[in-house]
Amino acid sequence: MTSRERLENRRASTILDFESMGGLKFTAGVSRYPDGRIAELFLDNHKAGSSIGTLVRDLAITFSFAVQHGADPEAIRRALCRDSQGRALGPLGAVLDLIAAETQR
């Protein structure tokens, strides 16, 4: 396993609000390494105490852990479930699509 690339204690993050999974509302916080690579992702939905909130927070922790150990965020994005038009079916895919679109601008 690749060793973890630590983050600075203080870092800027971007907040994104978006919908996924049939209109459920989510908020994402995205932190980056100084060179611009994604370093950390926080996900939450807008229903305190819900099961989906727990799942998306755990998903974001897993994603963050993976990229801090060398996983390619773009490879993860491409591997996630999509519908027949190529749209992300889940919140992680949806937020990674938003990040990819912002990066291409």
Feature map (PLM): residue ranges:
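Long, C-terminal-biased catalytic regions of enzyme "large/alpha" subunits
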Residues: 1-105
